[in-house]
Design a protein with these regions (language model features):
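N-terminal and secondary-structure boundary signal
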Residues: 1-315, 321-335, 340, 344, ...
Length: 376
């Protein structure tokens, strides 16, 4: 299995187009993936309504390059997503994705309506409620963003498909799959159901630390591409300086015998030797069960994971309350308040807060384990 890693110093159109084409050519060329007449859905990471310079969403110039390449093949591209907030059109506009679609004269599809998709091969989920238009397309291209993620360690090609679940329906999965491992297995099933033709990860700018929303911007200046999303994510996590095979989604895929190992991947391209050391999410170590004895995990899961804490800078906008899966957040006197008896540590509040007013703090047992050296 090949994964291409190419370099682009900026989001200037020519630089991005060159990097995208180099990557796809190394994988066999656009003709291997897209044929004339194909209807192609391009799925960006359009997490929330922030501008492209924040490194939260897929940059519109990467989307433009993919659109142009698909059109050049005589195919018919469209772009679509369902962000974690209700106003899809505002998000599409602010992220710059809508403008690119208008400039390139292609449709932007607002993921609003769901339908049931059966997947009997699923290990955890055999039926998904996803956006109703997926079967209208011959090919799907996932164009993700290179970021850390406080719940999943990293987010890339596979996690990007969570956006095919419409709007607040995402909360149902967080309620059903409340720990890293179970949620990761659902992502494996979701990926296998949708099975994109091609996966591209925008890492020209990226996010480290408390991603996918509140981290710090870094500049790896790379793009990653593969026909296999797990392989792309493995290489991405490794390039970020993470224990790639221990990340929940990748680990779940390995456990299901669905993916190959990092050592079996052929990495090619101008950026193949690039290596970085991203700051880890506050939750990073708690994702790796080997650090903590199993009996302790069973005794106090919430005290072993970081909890979200609302800072004084909270403006009481209500976004976290509206989208909290277990409804653990209320707004009192223009300030969010968390009921920790209900909190499931999904970190959706931290992920969606535009004011970076949600931070993560270690649980009591986690602090103790750090003090005595069991957990470093």
């Amino acid at each position: 299995m090949k994964v291409a890693v190419t370099k682009a110093k900026s989001y200037e159109k020519k630089a991005v187009g060159t990097a995208v084409d180099e990557a796809i050519n190394l994988l066999g060329g656009w003709q291997k993936f897209i044929q004339a007449g194909d209807k192609v859905l391009i799925k960006p990471n359009m997490l929330t309504n922030v501008t492209p310079d924040k490194a939260v969403t897929t940059h519109p110039e990467v989307i433009r390059s993919v659109i142009k390449a698909v059109k050049k093949m005589g195919a018919y591209p469209a772009v679509g997503d369902s962000p974690g907030i209700s106003n899809i059109k505002a998000t599409a506009k602010i992220t710059g994705i809508l403008s690119v679609c208008e400039e390139e004269n292609i449709p932007f599809i607002y993921f609003k309506q769901s339908k049931t998709y059966n997947y009997m091969e699923g290990r955890f989920i055999k039926q998904f409620e996803l956006v109703d238009c997926l079967n209208d397309f011959d090919k799907i291209i996932s164009v993700a963003k290179m970021k850390t993620h406080v719940f999943m360690g990293v987010t890339g090609a596979v996690k990007n498909l969570f956006g095919c679940i419409v709007g607040t329906e995402k909360a149902r999965f967080h309620l059903r799959m409340q720990n890293h491992s179970d949620f990761a297995h659902v992502m494996v099933d979701l990926y296998q159901l949708i099975k994109p033709t091609l996966n591209i990860i925008d890492g020209i700018t990226a996010m480290e630390g408390q991603g996918p929303m509140s981290g710090d911007i870094v500049n790896p200046q790379i793009l990653i591409a593969s026909e296999d999303g797990f392989a792309a994510d493995l290489v991405m996590a490794d390039k970020m300086g993470f224990n790639a095979e221990a990340m929940p989604i990748v680990s779940a895929g390995i456990g299901q015998n669905r993916i190959i190992r990092l050592a079996d991947i052929e990495i090619v391209g101008s950026g193949k030797d690039e290596q970085f050391e991203f700051a880890k999410p506050h939750t990073y170590k708690s994702m790796q069960d080997t650090y903590i004895p199993r009996f302790i995990l069973k005794l106090g899961q919430n005290q072993l994971t970081a909890k979200p804490v609302i800072k004084k800078s909270c403006v009481g906008c209500g976004r976290c309350s509206e989208h909290c899966p277990p409804k653990a957040i209320t707004i009192i006197n223009k300030h969010a308040k968390i009921d920790y008896q209900k909190c499931i540590r999904c970190y959706c509040c931290q992920e969606l807060c535009s004011y970076q007013a949600v931070i993560l703090q270690d649980g009591i047992i986690l602090k103790l384990l750090k003090c005595i050296g069991i957990y470093k």
